[in-house]
């Protein structure tokens, strides 16, 4: 009896141990581990959306409510956007990936493949509307109530569709009544296609009412005004080919340019009251498409062609280029567009066998022949900027061969731009390497006159937000410089006397880079420049002494400014600013706040984790989402306000990790043969026993110990060691 009891007990304990033993990561896990994609937070901070996507397989959309901590799940949902009024989520519903793969193997024709569907979720009621066969959609961020979606080519018989991703029938509304011609022949109805377009639908999100426009090729929307712009190939005499504006408030489709042609690069100004686009009205299919630039504003009956091949403004053998999208300044006072010289055309009278196919290379070329081939498409699309002053009806050539590139100032509102020219130094770049020197210019947008401010700058010049200064980091001088537009004086800002503003750990045979600029304060008064650890406040005129705002060097703590408002053009010196904090010695990180006028930053959250450097804040509240990670902690989405006291976990991307043997990482110190003290990382399997021997992998690659607290997701790779995979299998790294 005792023997039987002992035997049963041993069997039970063995079973328990076997059951409790964690699994090793296998190759299946390399392709099934989830990543978080396309995360966003609503303007009011009450909603967070994100997709979970494995290496291979279908994504899952998650919609989280901060009020009740509940999450809704939508299979195969991707690319979600939250409406500006926080009432709706609009997203794509993809077909099953396995289905698509199987059909590709069977070589099913593209038009028979399953298409994406559209999902519209009402956040208040949780009602979901699905619309099949949608290839794209646009949901405005700064105004609300409408969504536009572009349909796929309609199938003649929807009952024969290969896969219906929403299980909904789509009525065929494209058929028109057939009219008999005078000769008694039936006129075929126009069909949708790549050259004729498909349906564009404007949907009122609240009422569900829809306005359908047929045979649409492309569409866009205004940033702030409730308007959409589209071009259609037309249907008949009642709806002709051209460019149309849909006003959501009036629910009205207005023709702004009716003409047969080809239209590209439609754009609004910020308010939606002005429109520009490229128009090719030629019907002869010339080798060089004669595009013109069209313009329309509120109150105009029709758009007008500002510039085309007949305009005296253009130099001989130059044209309006359709390669670059025209753009308005923020205040709408300027319209920028590109012009280019006509390309060299091939002799079309030659037969194919008469065309000599040879590549000619010369040692005198400024650019290596292989690089010329690599850059060929880019050079074919190169444009030179022109500005049209909308109030003055005046064109000014800004860019040309001597100043081929420009940077706009003050969101395009400024009357000057910064010009670049690296052409004189292109050849020497072959042996000099990066950065390529360039000459810097200030270009007057009223006159087109160019003033050279500095030759052969080995670094990128940038205009300040209000276009009062130009700053650049000179690589040979390892210093920042500032140029005043008003005084026309150059000032060296950083001296590298007590603190280096170049990469202190640079160890390659080239010039060291800088640590970057955090930004500018209001009205371009100060520029904030980073060193290895700290943020410094500099007077761009050089009159005031620089001020160290963060004082992190003593403790080897690095502070970096976090830009929470993507549209903020300056840093408000009177408000507290969120900083990312990282300690180089311990590798701990976190967040802190800084008030520039009151002293040192205050750390409010810190730990042995890698906290995200770019948390995202809700537009209208102090709620934000961020991540933290370590070798054992996946970077799931976290949610909090600026106190960081009540942190909620939003996502749980890989709950299965608890079932697998993982491991841990720690810093490892040693002295090299030259007597230098070095820092590395040592990763050990879970339940590491120092008395046992383990197989070990050694990875020498640059400086990676700062990534001690980085999560290493199982994933396939060609030339890297997947840490979690090997450690799970008993290796040390």
Regions found by a protein language model. Give the residues of each.
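Beta-propeller folds
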Residues: 13, 20-623, 629-635, 639-640, ...
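Serine-hydrolase catalytic core recognition
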Residues: 613-733
């Amino acid at each position: 009896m005792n023997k039987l009891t002992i035997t049963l007990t041993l069997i039970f304990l063995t079973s328990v141990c076997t059951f409790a033993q964690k699994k090793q990561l296998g190759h299946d896990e390399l392709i099934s581990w989830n990543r978080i994609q396309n995360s966003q937070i609503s303007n009011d901070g009450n909603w967070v959306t994100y997709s979970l996507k494995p290496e291979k397989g279908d994504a899952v959309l998650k919609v989280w409510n901060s009020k009740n901590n509940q999450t809704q799940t939508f299979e195969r949902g991707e690319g979600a956007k939250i409406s500006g009024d926080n009432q709706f989520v609009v997203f794509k519903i993809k077909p099953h990936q396995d289905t698509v793969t199987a059909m590709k193997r069977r070589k099913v024709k593209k038009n028979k493949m399953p298409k994406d569907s559209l999902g519209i979720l009402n956040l208040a009621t949780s009602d979901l509307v699905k619309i099949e066969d949608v290839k794209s959609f646009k949901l405005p961020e700064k105004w609300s109530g409408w969504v536009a979606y572009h349909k796929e080519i309609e199938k003649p018989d929807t009952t024969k569709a290969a896969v219906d991703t929403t299980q909904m029938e789509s009525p065929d509304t494209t058929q028109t009544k057939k009219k008999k011609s005078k000769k008694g022949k039936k006129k075929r109805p126009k069909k949708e296609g790549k050259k004729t377009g498909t349906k564009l639908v404007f949907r009122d999100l609240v009422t569900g009412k829809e306005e359908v426009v047929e045979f649409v090729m492309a569409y866009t929307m205004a940033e702030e005004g409730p308007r959409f712009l589209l071009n259609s190939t037309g249907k008949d005499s009642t709806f002709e080919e051209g460019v149309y504006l849909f006003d959501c408030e009036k629910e009205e489709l207005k023709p702004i340019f009716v003409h047969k042609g080809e239209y590209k690069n439609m754009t609004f100004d910020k308010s939606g009251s002005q429109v520009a686009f490229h128009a090719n009205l030629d019907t002869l299919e010339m080798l060089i498409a004669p595009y013109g630039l069209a313009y329309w504003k509120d109150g105009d009956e029709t758009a007008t062609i500002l510039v085309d091949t007949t305009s005296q403004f253009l130099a001989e053998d130059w044209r309006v280029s359709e390669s670059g999208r025209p753009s308005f300044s923020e205040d709408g006072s300027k319209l920028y567009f590109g012009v280019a010289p006509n390309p060299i055309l091939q002799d079309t009278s030659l037969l194919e066998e008469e065309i000599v196919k040879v590549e000619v290379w010369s040692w005198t070329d400024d650019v290596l022949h292989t690089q010329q081939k690599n850059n060929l498409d880019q050079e074919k699309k190169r444009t030179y900027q022109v500005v049209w002053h909308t109030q003055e009806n005046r064109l000014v050539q800004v860019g040309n061969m001597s100043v081929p590139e420009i940077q706009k100032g003050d969101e395009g509102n400024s009357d000057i731009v910064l010009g670049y020219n690296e052409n004189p130094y292109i050849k020497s770049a072959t042996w000099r390497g990066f950065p390529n020197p360039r000459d810097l210019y200030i270009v007057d947008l009223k006159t087109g006159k160019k003033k050279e401010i500095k030759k052969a700058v080995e670094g990128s010049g940038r205009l300040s937000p209000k276009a009062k200064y130009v700053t650049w980091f000179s690589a040979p001088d390892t210093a920042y410089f500032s140029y005043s537009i008003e005084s026309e004086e150059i000032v060296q800002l950083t001296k590298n006397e007590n603190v280096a503003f170049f990469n202190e750990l640079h160890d390659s045979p080239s010039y060291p880079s800088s640590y970057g600029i955090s930004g500018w304060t209001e009205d371009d008064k100060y520029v904030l420049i980073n060193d290895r650890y700290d943020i410094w406040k500099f007077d761009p005129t050089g009159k005031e002494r620089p001020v160290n705002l963060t004082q992190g060097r003593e403790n080897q703590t690095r502070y970096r400014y976090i830009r929470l408002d993507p549209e903020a053009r300056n840093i408000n010196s009177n408000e507290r600013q969120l900083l990312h904090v990282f300690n180089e010695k311990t590798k701990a990180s976190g967040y802190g706040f800084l008030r520039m006028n009151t002293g040192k930053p205050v750390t409010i959250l810190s730990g042995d984790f890698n906290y995200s450097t770019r948390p995202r804040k809700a537009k209208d509240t102090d709620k934000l989402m961020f991540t933290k990670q370590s070798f054992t902690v996946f970077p799931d989405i976290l949610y909090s306000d600026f106190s960081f006291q009540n942190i909620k976990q939003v996502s749980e991307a890989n709950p299965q990790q608890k079932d697998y043997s993982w491991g841990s990482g720690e810093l490892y110190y040693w002295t090299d043969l030259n007597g230098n003290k070095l820092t590395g990382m040592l990763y050990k399997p879970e339940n590491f026993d120092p008395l046992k021997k383990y197989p070990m992998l050694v990875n020498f690659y640059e400086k990676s110990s700062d990534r001690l607290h980085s999560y290493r997701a199982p994933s396939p790779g060609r030339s890297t060691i997947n840490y979690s995979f090997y450690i799970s299998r008993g290796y040390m790294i």
